[in-house]
Amino acid sequence: MNTQEKHQFEPVLPQAHDDPTLSKPPIFFNRTADKGMIKRLIAWFLVHYGLADTVSMIEDLKQVGFQYATRAGISLGIEDLRIPPTKPRLLQEAHREINRMEFRYQQGYVSLVERFQKVIDTWNGTSELLKDDVVENFLATDPLNPVYMMAFSGARGNLSQVRQLVGMRGLMSNPQGEIIDLPIRSNFREGLTVTEYIISCYGARKGLVDTALRTANSGYLTRRLVDVAQDIVIRMTSCSPSAYPLISFTKSGKEVVYPLEERLLGRVLAIGAFNQEGELISGPDTAISQEIAVQLMDCDPKEILVRSVLLCKSKRGLCRLCYGWNLGTGTIVSIGEAVGIIAAQSIGEPGTQLTMRTFHTGGVFAGGVTNEIRAPHAGLVHYPRPIHPKWVRTRHGQFGILISEKIEIIFEHESKKTIQVFDAGTVLTIHEGEKVHTNQLIGEIPAHGTLVTGWRSLKSGVDGEVRFDELELLKQRPRSDRTSPVRLDPRVCNKAHLWILQGHVNTFEMPIQLVANIGDKVEKDSIVSTTKQVVSEEGRIIYRYDEKRGKEQTIITHAFGSVQFDGVDAWLPTKSQGIKQSIRTTGGKLSISSQGMTLSATKIKQEGIGSFDWPALAEPSIEEDEELEEAYKKTKDPIIQPTPYPLQYCVLPEQKYVIQAQEGWIISVLGGQSVGASQSLATYVDSQWEVEQGQLSIRSIEYRVHDQSWIQVITPSLVEIESGRGSYHLMAKAGWIIPISTKIRCKDYRLISGSILLGKWSLPISRFAVEQAASYPAILIRPIHTYPVYPTTIWDETINWQRGIASIGSNDWHPRCIAPTYQAPSYVESFKGRQTFTGEEKQEGNKPVEITSKNRRKSAANSSHETRMTQNRTWPIVLADTRIQKGASPIQIEWTWPHAKNPWISPNHGAIAGHIRFVNMTILDSSSISTKQELDHREAQVIPTTQTVSGVHRLTPLLEKTVFSQDDGEIQRMLPFSRALVKPVRTNRSKTRRNASGKTQVKAQARSQAKARSVRLKLKETVKTRSQEKFTNEMKKQLAKSSEGNKGFQIRQALFPKKLIRLMVVLRPVDIMTFATYGARVCIPLGAMIYQGEELFEGASTPISGQLIEIRRDRVTLRIGQPYRVGWQSRLMVTRDQIVKAEKVLAHLLYFKTKTGDIVQGLPKIEEILEARRKKGNEIIRSNLQDFVQQFYQDNLDEGFSRKYASTRTMRAMQVLILRRVQLVYRSQGVQISDKHLEIISLRMTSRVLVEKAYGTGILPGEIIEKRRADMLNQGRTRIRYCPIVLGITKASLTTKGFISSASFQETTRVLTQAVLQGKSDWLLGLKENVILGRLIPAGVGIYGHWVGPHEFNIKQMLKLWVLPPIITGQSTMRAMFHSTTRYWQDLEAVMESPNKLYPVTPYKCYPDTQHLAGLSIWMPEFEFRRFETFTEEEMVAAESLFTAHPNCHARRINNKQLNSLI
């Protein structure tokens, strides 16, 4: 009984009587007696009046109870279930709150997790308020209501069940243990709907099935505990321990779950205790009663020294004082008490009861993350003094004020005034002068507990395209390597929005050629592909992969290289892997084309154009290991073609152009500068352009790249753009190029200086048009100023990238850049091309504008319009059997142009260089050959990019291989393979020159061999190429020779590992919404994302969220979209512009919750601790006992402690840890178990050690023996090196010294077989062994034995009881057993000099009738009946040896006095 209960339970004492016969005054209790009250009454009575009086008092209570029970009965009718009248109002308020949250979620202001937590908390709060109203309603209207009386009697039923009857059933959890955010609003009185009934079945399953299953588990736990502790019996009064433990209160977080006063009750003080005045409260070796505990607590101690089971020195069993009270009687325990069995039952039995309770606490999801603060009453909020607020976001998505110091807040209502004090760390959601209502949530206090993180999947609600809004990804560089490139992490490092723009997604499988183009209008059931798949909806195609391109159409393809993420799927999805195949044949023969193979004997011109973007989550950036590809063609179309990339809308009526640009990087580098490999100089720009009758409007969004190694300073300036509707004041960033012309034919560009900060005045924009001009000026704005944080590192590697219009210098770095820097061509963004600005001479079309590098293109003197291509091929410079770098030099294209040009602009002749990656190959021979070929083109042709794949990285773009025909310059192109490595398995090349004498001179020969593995698909392709080479000999006579070579290709991985899905988005009428503006000014720029409720045009807000895709004079059109808020550290699973279907996982959102102490987790948790299980998987925090033991032991050794002392310290620490962990689980469920029971179990779990080395003992390394025995052996000449271990209760039971107990527990056959082979002995020391053999158990009175008196005793019985219990062995004779000395003396725990001395005194006899026990014999000692004095000296030595051998006896010579003390 604790102090609180004692104060609650104070008997009413009447006045003192004069009658001297009354020894104790009568006591009168005047209060309602419920279950808890009767409990306390019995406990108090037992302490004050003893056991006998308590029994008779309980009998009287029983009679009174029965008497009153028959006076009146309680019936329960359906009318007794009264629903409180406040329920409809509470439900209405909850619905209103949740609808408000849902609206904020649709607007994108709160995330999925914040909405979920708000819903859970709202229903939880409603349920709790309703529960209070149920009680108040019963008290006010009918205090004698049968339901109310039952709930509060404590006999059966409780308030949570009554709440379900007349309140609301509340929240349920699903089979995974997660809360379902749809609560059961009804109660059982009203009846459940079908949905509610289905949901409630989850909870019912927990109640019925789980109880049945877990009761068995709990019973098994009890059985194991009994087995491990059954032989622990109180065997002596005091053991004189050398050390005592300090005990203090047990805390969970900041809450004290096991007060010190409770822990002290029933323990024995180790030393005397004095109060603050120096008076003795209690002496040493005194039991701590309730009164002494209260007096000790008045001194406010932090820790107290007591005697403990863990430090008892008794050889076997325990002593009375170390154990303390028998908690059943409140007195010191008696000798012979089987405390091990009591401890096992005390721990195991509550587990059985706990399984009966299954908790459905609503707050498991965010259980205890915060404690809520509610308003005491309605009124106005007033802050008496100003505070310095720190704005934070609460877990419900609201903005709150985090207070850093203690403050007071006043709530005023008419004449009523309440002052409430809030501690530092509180988050308040109310402001000065705000009006609050009663019980309104005004703040929260973060809970101090172990927070665990969880992930919740955000799924798309509709089909459509992904867009990011102000999203920043984490950029990281490995700490170990400062020179390695920065990698993008898929984690979000800010709070931003992810949009899904609605549209119907159609799916096509790979071999289909699409008929419809971007911008085409399609109707329902129209043909959009060659296989006549039909579109299910009407609409306009706005986005399509792998569009069909004509010869004169602009082609811009882009491939980005490998970006590797940790923690994402092994294969990142790429946005498209489209392939366009076109095959031209000559000679009238038809060639066969298949997906992965081309076989034709005719001359084939084949074009394969890939359409793809960067892999998911990777933003485009130039890095060390990336492969870039550009290919351009001239266009001669009379109007501007829309870009084949994400395009919102394009219409060309009445010379009005509305064009959406593709997002891209602007690399802010002028000619001659270098770009760092981390690409921090890049600014990401998302531009929308509108050109309408001479008016221009621009809106740009800037993306900053987070990098740990760079600081960025951006100098803004102001641009004013004039238009018919008024002026736009835009903040232009350095790095922009602003087009300022009014016509498409020719553009003029003006510099926005990064170093001039423009103020409030406007910068007028000139309008002019040039019909035809020789040059097109464009100026790039100064780059972002970049200041390095770390000192410059020079990187020695050189890489040459050469292209037709720009080449990249090697060994060129900028002194301000960190780590490796390479020079790259700098492109700027246009509204047409991916990385080009547009402008075409005498044409309305596109042409790349390029900021040149300092290595200018080569110019020739002659003036002609022909293109000459020089191709250099270098075969490998081979070292035998070594890993070499194969450098394939790029193709250089030289051309001449007669006109004088502006150096900033280069005309596009359609000739583009290829660049070939470096490939590591193992070549098996050592010769090289070099050839140079020249091809003359009579007309300009596009040379597609040659690109090979190194196979080093996991994620590489499509492989494209170009084979140059040697006949007349026609290009033959291989099919591209996705992530495939196609290498020639065997290649022979030879050139033969024949001269007049007919001798053959071999110029050079090269053979390369490479091995390729086939992953999914084995295809063999044999291509026969016939080529004619012209040779000239010395006699000017031309001979032609045909050479044939067979190439065998093995494809390492198939073109498409599964299948390519082509996707097409169709914008249907239901996906867009048009609003009439009535001439009002539109507030939002074209292409902007607009959130529900924002102002669309003057005086009107939008009822939906979406993107503005069209502005007309009298109306605007929105494309419907859904914004999703993604928070900090969320993991993205999609990339920008990806097409997704409904229910696709977009991101995983992070949330926090506290560890809950639900008993559903509780029982397995207790089992896990007591079994000392090692958890599987990689834990961040080590929590299993095995790891703790090793770590703690090592730490002690490192501190310089000896092995023995380090082991002892480790064992003590583990005992305390086990005790604390189990107590926390039980206490969290309100179950109270005394420490001493857990101490007995933890003592058994930590009493053994693992032998590492044993010298001269016969003990093998890896054996588990008792620590006490190891220390005893170490006292002699032998040396055992051991380390501490923690054994689970099952393992501890199976490794006991006696094998009968182990065999009866588990694995009977194995244990008995092992015992026979090892010749084990069982000394029958425990209770279980004796019960099995039908002997008297060594507990209770059986522990004393029977003898006549101090001197008239029976030596045979004395030795039998104290010294030699029966020995059970598998040996055939006693002598044989004695002579297998190693094992036998191991079990006897000491080595005797001469075992032969035993025989005259202790002849053993075998009892043949006992051989039924698995072939084992029982040997019983036989002694003659004579007095102790008649023993000879020799016999005395033998008897002394027996005492020494027995675990309970000390090694000493025995005389009368000592023998008497044993008795």
From Swiss-Prot:
Its EC number is 2.7.7.6. One of its GO terms (molecular function) is DNA binding. It is an enzyme of class 2 (transferase). It catalyses: RNA(n) + a ribonucleoside 5'-triphosphate = RNA(n+1) + diphosphate. Binds 1 Zn(2+) ion per subunit. It is found in: Plastid, Chloroplast. One of its GO terms (biological process) is DNA-templated transcription. Belongs to the RNA polymerase beta' chain family. RpoC2 subfamily. Its main location: plastid. It comes from Nephroselmis olivacea (Green alga). Residues 836-869, 987-1007 are annotated as: Disordered. Zn(2+) binds at C239, C312, C319, C322. The gene is rpoC2. It comes from the Eukaryota. This is DNA-directed RNA polymerase subunit beta''. One of its GO terms (cellular component) is DNA-directed RNA polymerase complex. The keyword Aminoacyl-tRNA synthetase does not apply. Residues 860-869, 997-1007 have a biased composition (Polar residues). DNA-dependent RNA polymerase catalyzes the transcription of DNA into RNA using the four ribonucleoside triphosphates as substrates. Residues 987-996 have a biased composition (Basic residues). Keywords: Chloroplast, DNA-directed RNA polymerase, Metal-binding, Nucleotidyltransferase, Plastid, Transcription, Transferase, Zinc. In plastids the minimal PEP RNA polymerase catalytic core is composed of four subunits: alpha, beta, beta', and beta''. When a (nuclear-encoded) sigma factor is associated with the core the holoenzyme is formed, which can initiate transcription.
